[in-house]
Amino acid sequence: MKHKLLTLAATMTAAILSGCCGGGCKDGKNYRIRDGVIVFNEPKPSAGQQDMLQFAADPIDTVRVGFIGLGMRGSSAVSRFTNIDGTRTVALCDLEEDRVKKSQKTLENAGKPEAAEYFGEDSWKRLCEQDDVNLVYICTPWDKHVEMAVYAMQHGKHVAVEVPAATSVAECWQLVDVAEQTRKHCMMLENCVYDFYELATLNMVQQGLFGEVLHAEGSYIHNLADFWDRYYDNWRLAFDQAHAGDVYATHGLGPDCQVLDIHRGDRMDYLVSMATVSVAGLELAKKNMGAETFANGDQTSTLIHTVNGKTILLQHNVYTPRPYDRMYQVVGTKGYAEKYPSPGFAFEPDQINGYADYENLSAHKFVPGDVYKELLKKYQSPIVKDIEEKAKSVGGHGGMDFIMDYRLVWCLRNGKPLDMDVYDAAEWSCIGDLSAASIENGSKPVLVPDFTRGKWNKIQGYRHSE
C-alpha cells in the first residue's frame, strides 16, 4: 500500500511539472490527465508577488464596512455588526432597493448613522470605490463572489466573502493572486469553524488530548426543501442543476483542515470523488425550473489524502430527507470526537485523568455526560471566553456567526493575521471543481493545487491570533 501511495505521489509530481497543457488537456477544461491523474492548470505569479501567510495589515481603528447583497445572509450580517464595537456600516448595496431600505432601517433602529445606499446591477462597483470603506462584506450568489472580491481588493479594500469564496480552481487562483498583489486580506466567511463544539475540539487537539490526528470527516447534509424558494431568482438550484461535485464543501472541510494544520505543516495532496444518480434533485429541478437534466448527484462523497498521510472524508446532500448533519468527526491516536447525531468524546483513560470516575472511562465508548460537560468547559476556546454570552444573545446559527464577525473585526483592529486567510478560502472552495472533475472522469484521482506555491510548510500548526 505504501508503495502504491509513493508511486501515485511521484506520478502527480511528474504531472504538475510537465507543463501547462502538455500530456492531454481535456477540450474546454482547465485541467489535463496524465497517467490517470487529473492536474489542474496553475498560473504563474507576477514578478515580486509575495505570499500572504501570517499577513497582518496595519491596525484599523474603526472598521468601516460596505455590505454587498442584503438577502438572507447579508441582512443578518448588518444586524450583527450593530453589536460589534469599533465598526460602522457606511454602505449598503443590493439589486433590490427595498432590501437596502430594510437594512437602513436596521441601522436606524440600532441608533447607528445612516449608510450610503446603492442598488441596481453594477452599483456594487461604486460601493467598492467609496473612499471611507475599508472592508467589503460580500453576501451575493456564488457566481459573483470572485468578481466583486477582486474589484474590492484592487480598490484598496479588505474583503470578507461568503462561502464558497469561488466556484472554480481558476477563480481560486485569481483570489490568491490578487490578494498577494494588493496585500489585502481576503477571508471567506466560514462560520462553522466558530461553532462552540468545533472550537473546543480544536483546543483539545492543540493541547494534545487526541494524540496525533489521523482522519477527519465533515459534510453538508441539509434538506433544503424549506429554503429553495427563498433564493433570489432561484440562483442556488440553478447552480446545482448545472454543476456536478461537492459544490458546498466548506462547512465540513473548514474545521477538518484546522485540526489537520492544512497549509500549516501539511497540505491536501489528492482526492477522489463519486456521486449517486440524481433523482430527488432532478425531480426538484423539473418542478421549480422545468429542467430535464440535473448535474449534481443526490449524494456526493469525496475522500482526500494529505502529504503527511492523513485522510478527510466529505459528504454533500441537500436533496433527500436526511437530518441536518455536518458529520464532524476527528480521529486521533488517543481520542475521538463526533458531533452528530449526538456530540461526544472518547479518549484513552490516561488522556483525561483527574475527572470524576475517570478510572471507569473506556476508549470503547463516549465519556459520560458530566465528563463531557467538564471537558467542554475546561477546553473552551480562549477566543470565545469573553464573548460567549453576547454571541448567544446576538445569535446567528447559535452564536457562531457573531463570533466569526467579532474575530474578523478584532484581528483588523489589532493588526493581527486573520483566523482564515486567502489560502483557506481557495483550498476549501476548490473542492467543488476538483470533485466534479473526478466524478466526470470515472472517479480518477485529482491533484489538489498548492495555492501557497510551496510555502505550505512555512507555518507549523494552526493557531488563532491572540
Q: What positions do the PLM features span?
A:
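Predominantly a Rossmann-like dinucleotide-binding segment in NAD(P)-dependent oxidoreductases
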Residues: T182-M187, C192-A295, L408
